[in-house]
Amino acid sequence: MNMALAFNKSLPGLCTLDSYKKHFVEFNDWLKNAFEHQTVGSLVKARARFIDEVLVSLWQHFDLHKHKKISLIAVGGYGRGELHPCSDIDLLLLTDSKLDAQQKEQISQFITLLWDLRLEVGHSVRSVKESVTLGKEDITIATNLMEMRLLTGSKELFDELQLQVCKNSFWTSQAFFQAKRDEQQQRHAQYHGTAYNLEPNLKANPGGLRDIQTIGWVAKKHFNTRTMRELVAYQYLTEDEYQELMECEAYLWQMRFALHVESGRNENRILFDYQPAVAKRLGFGDDGKASVERMMKRFFQTVQRVAELNDMLLQHFDGSILNSQSKLKQQKLDDFFELTGHLIRATDNAVFARRENILRMFWHIANNSNITGIHSDTIRLLRLVRRRLMGDLQDYEACRQLFMTIMRHPRGMDRAITLMHRHGILASYLPAWRNIVGQMQFDLFHAYTVDEHTHRVLKNLYRYSQAGFENEFPLCTDIVKRMEKPEILYLAGIFHDIAKGRGGDHSELGSLDAREFGKLHKLSDFDSKLLAWLVESHLLMSVTAQRRDIHDPAVIAEFADKVRDETRLNYLYCLTLADIRATNDNLWNDWKGSLLRELYLGTQKAFRRGLEKPMDLRDLIREN
């Protein structure tokens, strides 16, 4: 079939199932071929228009157009005029009274034929009053009605419903915003609050398409607009932010379109089985894992951008447009930052001209447990300065000092490290970290990207000293309490997988990175060696416990010989537990825990019986 800018085949003259099936085959073939030449935005609109024509034709075929008090209305994504190859087609049949037997039969035949055409159709038959009542009770129905579009039938009924939906009595801006934010938080919780699952859901994952839609829904409701573009004029978002959102949406749409084509169904989870074919269709090549890595890395970087914009814009809408922050108490933190409610806020738009103030902000977050996040105004500033950075933040002496202060802070691995990860500051600080952002892991164990796995390791390490978790791993809690320098443990967590994806032994390469870090940050020789050894040996204890007979004295002696002393054993044990537990939510079990504990206690006993190798105590005393 020749490629054209638009599908130009006429609808079948005879309304038979076979003729319409043939028409759909021709259109779907055109749609697949057009993907190589046209934007996805134009194609999802083309499918919506195609379905419009089919529905109107069938509506007339079943004589439904003769009933003057029925409207056929597209709602949801179809209402927006956007349909991916296998997307649901959501319809509202709006009536002004109860249907008679003839009307019910005609509608039944109409819907049945759509199902026979294998369309994913969801439909409801309601009056204006019923639609409004249900919309007031259910935020999902309310959202669908906000995006309704008349296909055919009574415009009078459609206008009446639209008038009711636009009223403040239907949903106030404040109530609608709160309901959509709660809905989003519940959805995010289903995905453990992360977009970095290796088989993500393109729609529902944090940072996915639903998060982009939520940004628009809350503002469209308030300003009574139809498109995201209109919101720039209302100063809800800047032109640059709008363009960035559209760029992110376009890439997620490309992936979703290709996924529907490859799976042949309304599939939004990009499972491992589909990833190679989708990567090939998107032009990332046909070289297996490498193609998938390139595609997924861009995906994870995209959803990170969306998640940050979503956080910033929803907060901005709540605080500045709904004015919820006008009465919040403000507290000065220093010359550069203040606390507005529970959010840290820069006092000056030029505050980040001094690069160390970026790290200073995160030190405040670690130091003040009342701070739960960053103010939207300050996120905007942070995004701007992040793009203009020349070199790495670790190049600045003042930044290095503050980074190590955060590492040494008792709460440095709490909210501060999470926000540094979320807002790209770890990547701006450590050049090696940038390489693992969105880095896939192709094995049977890891459920998350390298950077998200590492973030989870750090959170697990922090739990050893966190109030309320003393009974989770009491041995680790006791060890960390006695640790002279727990920051070495946290740094080992940061570097343990930092060389993945480069080729070669990631433990050895990461150990070299750790040595360079120690040198740059003026760690003592003892601390640098301990850090480098932990990174190089971070798999040693796990492999020994799970693949060797730990009840064999020779195995214990061999392991003790590699570990050398009880100090290293303590650090390695705590790191190993945190690492395994952050790999996969289903990987950890009591059996693995007991194996590691037995290996730890057996090796500790061996050291205390005199197998511990002598250390250079003079160096240790001199350096500490």
Task: Go through the PLM ranges and name each one.
Residues 4, 10, 21, 170-321, ...:
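Conserved nucleotidyltransferase catalytic core and NTase-mimicking acidic/glycine-rich helix/loop elements
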